[in-house]
């Protein structure tokens, strides 16, 4: 079709699936450049490494896994005299994530726009253990420019919402967007795909309603079932053979 690999985004849910797709395409084409074949989070890392200046973060920000988060929590516990009897690190991670996503819509604007000094002040003023952890987490994050997995999506969406030039750049770059396992997509991932295909309007999705496995973390099967009602002029193909 005359489209370069770098103008195609193919998103799946696991690094293993993405690696398998890259291997298959390389075997078919012999081309080392297989385009953007990645998970949602990996794609967001790519966006942020290119455009993190829009949120005053360095290109070499840290991607935090659970062990990194636990190390940050340990600092907060020690600084504020908290104990694991009150709340384990695992429970603290869950509490913070729940409040970030459900109860504190101002969390991300604050993390992005407030100074380190202001975040520190909010942390030191907190008294209840939950509030200490919830205010100490963004302060500790910003000190090391660290982002956890959910932050990657939120920061990317924030940049696209706030900066029309950056949004248009990525929309124009990605001529074709393909999403695997669409039955497991959640609200943030769906919004990201809507934004990215807002220029070329070429969106291809693959899904099986009976195979959804991520409803426990926010996946909404309605995005697949209602696809032909939301997207103008779609074409639906039934895949009857397993490849």
Segments (PLM) and residue ranges:
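P-loop NTPase Walker
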Residues: 1-57, 63, 144, 168, ...
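Conserved helicase NTPase motor core
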Residues: 9, 36, 65-68, 123-226, ...
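Residue-level signature of catalytic and energy-coupling elements of molecular machines
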Residues: 14, 39, 73, 148, ...
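Short amphipathic alpha-helical segments
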Residues: 22-24, 49, 74, 190-191, ...
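ATP-hydrolysis module of ASCE/P-loop NTPase motor domains
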Residues: 32-35, 53-150, 236-242
